[in-house]
């Protein structure tokens, strides 16, 4: 939350959850809007050598950054932490000690975060929707496909920021969320 827009707090329940269990983090926003940067599949050093500067520029004004896995090197998380608080989940290529799932609660909106490698076929929207319902969330953010999407799938919003480094479509991308009384998602193309 930027200066003058109110205050927010954070509480984490569950301590160190088993990797298959979801960590639960609660954010309280009192007045104003919370901006969230969302990124996934950065693959630092196994497929990419650096994160594009445009990512840092786009995330320079966010309150929180969500990384949906396949970080592959702690350096990415450390550099993102210089910009904002970071919540990250473990991807299938990660050897970092991260939870497999996170559930964030921002005011009355529950946001689930997974990598998405448990869904087959890759990125199947019906299976993602069912997983989100099982997690009890209003919004499910995943990665793994390296392909961005915003899909209002009946009673759950499905989001995927794509990849800013190794996309499986022509578009390198990240996402920004704006949360006040409702959540709005915007796909951000990354130019090099």
UniProtKB/Swiss-Prot annotation:
E.C. designation(s): 3.1.4.-
Pfam families: Metallophos_2
Keyword hit for Hydrolase: yes
Cofactor binding description: Binds 2 divalent metal ions per subunit.
Alphabetized UniProt keyword annotations: Hydrolase, Metal-binding
Gene Ontology molecular functions: hydrolase activity; metal ion binding
SUPFAM superfamilies: Metallo-dependent phosphatases
UniProt-annotated binding residues for a divalent metal cation 2: 70, 92, 115, 144
PROSITE patterns in the cross-refs: UPF0025
Residues that bind a divalent metal cation 1: 41, 43, 70, 146
InterPro entries, A to Z: Calcineurin-like_PHP_lpxH, Metallo-depent_PP-like, MPP_YfcE, PdiEstase_YfcE_CS, Phosphodiesterase_MJ0936/Vps29
Cofactor list: a divalent metal cation
Top EC class of this enzyme: hydrolase
Presence of keyword Repressor: no
Lineage: superkingdom: Archaea
Family (UniProt): Belongs to the metallophosphoesterase superfamily. YfcE family.
Name of the featured protein: Probable metallophosphoesterase MJ0623
């Amino acid at each position: 939350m930027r200066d003058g827009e109110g205050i927010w707090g954070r509480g984490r329940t569950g301590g160190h959850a088993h990797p298959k269990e979801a960590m639960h983090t609660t954010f309280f926003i009192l007045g104003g809007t919370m901006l969230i940067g969302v990124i996934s599949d950065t693959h630092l050093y196994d497929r990419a050598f650096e994160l594009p500067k445009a990512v840092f520029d786009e995330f320079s004004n966010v309150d929180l950054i969500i990384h949906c896995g396949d970080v592959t090197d702690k350096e990415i998380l450390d550099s993102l932490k210089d910009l904002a608080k970071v919540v990250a989940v473990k991807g299938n290529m990660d050897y970092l000690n991260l939870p497999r799932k996170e559930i964030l609660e921002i005011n009355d909106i529950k946001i689930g975060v997974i990598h998405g490698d448990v869904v087959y076929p890759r990125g199947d929207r019906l299976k993602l929707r069912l997983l989100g319902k099982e997690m009890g969330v209003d919004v499910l953010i995943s990665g793994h496909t390296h392909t961005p999407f915003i899909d209002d799938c009946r009673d759950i919003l499905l989001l995927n920021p794509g990849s800013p480094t190794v996309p499986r479509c022509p578009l390198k991308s990240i996402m920004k969320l704006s949360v006040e009384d409702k959540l709005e998602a915007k796909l951000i193309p990354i130019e090099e």
